[in-house]
Amino acid sequence: MSLQRRRVNKTAGNETVGGASLNRSDEEEGMTHKVAYDPEEQKLRENTREPTLTLMEEVLLMGLKDKEGYLSFLNENISYALRGCILIELALRGRIQVVDDAMRRRFDPSERLIEVVDGSKTGEALLDEALTLMKGSEPLTIVNWMDLLSGETWNFLKINYQLRQVRERLAKGLVDKGVLRTEMKNFFLFDMPTHPVADTSCKESIKRRILSVLVPRNVELQYTELFPETVAFKYLRTIALICSAHGANVLEKVLSTLDYEKRDRGFSRAEELLVQFSQYPFALDKDIETGISVNLNRLVQEELDRNPGTALNLEVVAGVLKVYSRMDDLL
């Protein structure tokens, strides 16, 4: 089955940071009226297996200009890539998985059906909104969901599946988490909100985590309060971050501080990871030709051993990375 994206007209305010204000759903509005004790919120607070920042927030942060507080207007990839990040995040949190059908191996990883297996809230508004949409739908393929969440469909019966104002909502979430701040700036006679970086140490720690995989011979992750050592799938998360940043055309910003040779080898390693992890089972027996992060395969295998019963969840990750590997053809 060929992999195609179909475009429909979207309003300019749907995606640009600083666009039109968010229209909250009734459910989201209701979240502002909190009861004294919510067992589900208590469970979320006690859960140390998830990082403070989602994969989508990390990718957006890598693309933002630190002082200006907005993304490059020329970046056409990031909106679509962020929808893939949503699917990866839901899969790593155990909410969705590939439908367990023996016939699925006949199809490309991106063309395999996915289903909701845990409909409980994550505490992240965008993830929960996507999860609600998926719960109310028949199983669709990974690339179908990326198209629908992006509004890239000719099926007008499913146009309401589009997640709107994703970049602006992610930026506001980072403001709430103390990573960004909001400033009003003038663009062509209009005042619009921008979100400069408030906590540079957070962004720098994410960059260091990426570079720890793309530069040295051996991986050694550095942990922070926002990304503690207790996080589940910390190596797979970092690989997904690198591949998502590559697909979103923001990886270059991370590698720009390196000299030419290291930058070139870093890109080569990122592309090597994209090929290796866009199939399932992951190609952990593949020789690492770049000679970078040579211990990564072993570390990932140890993660898989510590998390049995997650194969169908991780197959979603592989399917999204497969879409990223074809981004140049899609756009």
Curated annotation (Swiss-Prot):
Bias kind Basic and acidic residues: ranges: 30-42
GO cellular component, one term: cytosol
UniProt-recorded Gene Ontology molecular function terms: enzyme binding; phosphatidylinositol-4-phosphate binding
Membrane topology term: Peripheral membrane protein
Superkingdom: Eukaryota
Binding site for a 1,2-diacyl-sn-glycero-3-phospho-(1D-myo-inositol 4-phosphate): 83, 164, 167
Region (Disordered): 1-42
Protein's job: Phosphatidylinositol-4-phosphate-binding protein that links Golgi membranes to the cytoskeleton and may participate in the tensile force required for vesicle budding from the Golgi. Thereby, may play a role in Golgi membrane trafficking and could indirectly give its flattened shape to the Golgi apparatus. May also bind to the coatomer to regulate Golgi membrane trafficking. May play a role in anterograde transport from the Golgi to the plasma membrane and regulate secretion.
Protein name per its UniProtKB record: Vacuolar protein sorting-associated protein 74
Organism expressing this protein natively: Eremothecium gossypii (strain ATCC 10895 / CBS 109.51 / FGSC 9923 / NRRL Y-1056) (Yeast)
Gene: VPS74
